[in-house]
């Protein structure tokens, strides 16, 4: 639907590249499959963090290849959806090079970069402290996302707008091959559709909104 803000996560850690693997050889393995975030973090020395960005001793993402793949993913989105994404968003593992590539592509296509838009709008993230990487399946099974989410809301500092990132979905054999974030997706979906969460939001006068509403009133694009 035109009024649903469907954006794109620039994915550099799972599945196959949109680009010809020969042109993004540093991003994929010998089978053309993206190198996982767990493998990147295991094989490269982390020296710090800056917000959502992970700082490595040497950035594992070649900038030019990352830029090519980022733009090709946006092109594929447009091809499939018939419109530009409502926003660009980093996925799983963000570094200086992945962020720089996203900034360039976002500017080229006149699409907001989610984290920049949220920062400029003074939006605060609802802290999610229960999803370590890697995330053992047994721990995922025992995680009560609904309870944790409501507690996170209760403990947040006052703000006009907050946002929460979750991965509502289902689990199948293909997913198990692609990510360590598996069973928790079912828990995320349970949380997002929970009557308990709905009742908490209503009771505390918390309204649901859209990233589109944070955009400039002068933006003529309808997402």
Describe each PLM feature range.
Residues 17-58, 180:
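Active-site gating loops and adjacent loop-to-helix segments of metal-dependent hydrolytic enzymes
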Residues 9-15, 91-93, 118-120, 129-136, ...:
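Active-site beta-loop-alpha junctions enriched in small/polar residues
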Residues 3-9, 85-89, 112-114, 161-165, ...:
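Structural preference for beta-strand elements that scaffold enzyme active sites
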Residues 151-174, 207-209:
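Aromatic-lined glycan-binding groove of carbohydrate-active enzymes
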Residues 16-22, 99, 125, 173-180, ...:
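Histidine/acidic-residue-rich catalytic or RNA/ligand-binding cores of hydrolases
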Residues 1-5, 26-29, 78-79, 154-157:
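Acidic (Asp/Glu)-rich catalytic clusters
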Residues 113, 178-223:
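C-terminal domain-boundary segment and adjacent tail
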Residues 63-130, 136, 147, 154-157:
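Catalytic domains of cell-wall/extracellular-matrix polysaccharide-remodeling enzymes
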């Amino acid at each position: 639907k035109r009024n649903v803000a469907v954006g794109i996560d620039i994915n550099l850690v799972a599945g196959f590249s949109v680009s010809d693997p020969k042109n993004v050889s540093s991003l994929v393995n010998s089978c053309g499959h993206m190198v996982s975030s767990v493998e990147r973090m295991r094989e490269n020395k982390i020296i710090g963090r800056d917000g959502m960005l992970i700082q490595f001793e040497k950035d594992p993402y070649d900038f030019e290849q990352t830029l090519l793949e980022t733009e090709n993913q946006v092109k594929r989105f447009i091809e499939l959806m018939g419109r530009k994404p409502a926003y660009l968003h980093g996925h799983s593992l963000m570094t200086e090079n992945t962020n720089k590539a996203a900034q360039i592509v976002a500017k080229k296509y006149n699409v907001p970069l989610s984290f920049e838009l949220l920062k400029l709008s003074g939006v605060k993230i609802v802290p999610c402290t229960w999803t370590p990487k890697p995330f053992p399946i047994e721990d995922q099974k025992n995680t009560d996302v609904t309870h944790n989410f409501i507690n996170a809301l209760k403990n947040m500092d006052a703000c006009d707008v907050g946002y929460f990132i979750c991965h509502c979905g289902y689990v199948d054999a293909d997913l198990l091959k692609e990510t360590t974030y598996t069973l928790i997706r079912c828990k995320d979906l349970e949380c997002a559709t929970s009557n308990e969460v709905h009742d908490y939001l209503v009771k505390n006068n918390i309204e649901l909104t859209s990233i589109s509403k944070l955009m400039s009133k002068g933006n003529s694009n309808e997402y």
